[in-house]
Amino acid sequence: MSADPRHYDVIVAPVITEKATNLSELNKVVFRVAPKATKPQIKEAVEKLFEVKVKSVNTLVTKGKTKMFRGQRGQRSDVKKAIVTLEEGQTIDVTTGL
């Protein structure tokens, strides 16, 4: 199973937070993904890049906050995250990188 270069465009970065760490105990991993990435694309990218079996993918979009910058109102970018549930016995060590 070789990774297609497009898979690297789908997965942006792992999310390392307290909540994401707690989810890892439930066999789930959280990634920041491209805003236009679909669930099947995310599933395929994770399976090819990390060589694991994915059970399901849940996505969420965090809307960017409005902030003041030099007296002007600005908008931060929206962030899309994917919570990937792995099959039993499968693990991903997100600290090692790709």
Curated annotation (Swiss-Prot):
Listed GO CC annotations: ribonucleoprotein complex; ribosome
SUPFAM superfamilies hit by this protein: Ribosomal proteins S24e, L23 and L15e
Bilayer-crossing regions: none
Record-level GO BP terms: translation
Entry annotated with the keyword Ribosomal protein: yes
Pfam families: Ribosomal_L23
Keywords, in A-Z order: Ribonucleoprotein, Ribosomal protein, RNA-binding, rRNA-binding
GO MF annotation: an example: structural constituent of ribosome
The protein's role, per its UniProt record: One of the early assembly proteins it binds 23S rRNA. One of the proteins that surrounds the polypeptide exit tunnel on the outside of the ribosome. Forms the main docking site for trigger factor binding to the ribosome.
Subunit structure and binding partners: Part of the 50S ribosomal subunit. Contacts protein L29, and trigger factor when it is bound to the ribosome.
Name under which the protein is recorded: Large ribosomal subunit protein uL23
Gene: rplW
